[in-house]
């Protein structure tokens, strides 16, 4: 598979349609759990989760009293989330999206790059949590994604960004993201702090075939600006 094949929405729709979703976790992400207390949470906190899939992390936020806004391309993923977790919902149709609305959670079925178009329909969010969106995109789209998120985030948006860093350039997602890249793409408005870096114990065989010998989980935080 070459880079161009991961550049389009059909790639991800096919992954969901074929249940090729090994990136889905059965428990909340360990780095979210570890660093959640670093976020400033209150009764009105709302978290935006781009490319949310059917992530169990959404339940973690809900369990902490945080309302959730998800953006997801695959309607199958959204339906799976609500059915697997027996959450009631209503469906609302918009011009650029289809909204699945439950108690304290809204998931918009839409292309992530349509986010600026639907931003006015979203509740105001004070947290942006990104576990798999940024690293799911090849380099050119990551640059565009960063520009878009700079548009929709405010000075008070708290950000917990989970990425991966490899010793070889990835040909498939998740892609390697360095601190230097984040500075380049976000420094105009957002300053990230590296708060965690953990080496992966077992590198997948397909990564070894690419020549990879080291892989790290890295976590970045941007706190609320007072």
Swiss-Prot record:
Grouped into one coarse class, the protein's main location is: cytoplasm
Q: Which reaction does it catalyse?
A: S-adenosyl-L-methionine + a thiopurine = S-adenosyl-L-homocysteine + a thiopurine S-methylether
Keyword Transferase listed? The answer is yes
Record EC number: 2.1.1.67
Source organism superkingdom: Bacteria
Matching entries from Pfam families are given as: TPMT
Where along this sequence does the record place binding of S-adenosyl-L-methionine? 16, 51, 72, 131
**Annotated keywords:** Cytoplasm, Methyltransferase, S-adenosyl-L-methionine, Transferase
| Single Gene Ontology MF annotation | thiopurine S-methyltransferase activity
What PROSITE patterns does this protein map onto? SAM_MT_TPMT
Does the keyword Ligase belong to this entry? no
User: Quick one: a GO biological-process term for this protein?
Assistant: methylation
GO cellular component annotations, sorted alphabetically?
Answer: cytoplasm
The entry's localization annotation reads: Cytoplasm
Q: Matching InterPro entries, A to Z?
A: SAM-dependent_MTases_sf, Thiopurine_S-MeTrfase, TPMT
Membership in a protein family: Belongs to the class I-like SAM-binding methyltransferase superfamily. TPMT family.
Q: State the name under which the record lists this protein.
A: Thiopurine S-methyltransferase
Q: Which organism is it from?
A: Francisella tularensis subsp. tularensis (strain SCHU S4 / Schu 4)
């Amino acid at each position: 598979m070459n880079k161009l094949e991961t550049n389009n929405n059909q790639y991800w729709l096919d992954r969901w349609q074929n249940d090729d979703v090994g990136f889905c976790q059965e428990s909340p992400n360990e780095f979210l759990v570890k660093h959640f207390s670093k976020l400033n949470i209150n009764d009105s906190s709302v978290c935006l989760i781009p490319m949310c899939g059917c992530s169990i992390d959404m339940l973690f936020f809900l369990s902490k009293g945080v309302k959730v806004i998800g953006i997801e391309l695959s309607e199958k993923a959204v339906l799976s989330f609500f059915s697997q977790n027996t959450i009631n919902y209503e469906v609302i149709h918009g011009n650029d999206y289809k909204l699945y609305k439950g108690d304290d959670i809204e998931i918009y079925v839409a292309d992530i790059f349509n986010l600026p178009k639907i931003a006015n329909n979203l509740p105001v969010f004070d947290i942006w949590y990104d576990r798999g969106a940024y690293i799911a995109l090849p380099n050119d789209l990551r640059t565009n994604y960063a520009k878009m998120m700079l548009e929709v985030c405010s000075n008070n948006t708290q950000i917990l960004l989970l990425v991966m860093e490899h010793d070889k350039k990835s040909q498939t997602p998740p892609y390697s993201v360095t601190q230097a890249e984040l500075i380049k793409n976000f420094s105009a408005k957002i300053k990230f702090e590296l708060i965690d870096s953990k080496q992966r114990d077992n590198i997948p065989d397909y990564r070894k075939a690419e020549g990879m010998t080291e892989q790290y989980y890295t976590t970045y935080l941007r706190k609320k600006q007072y």
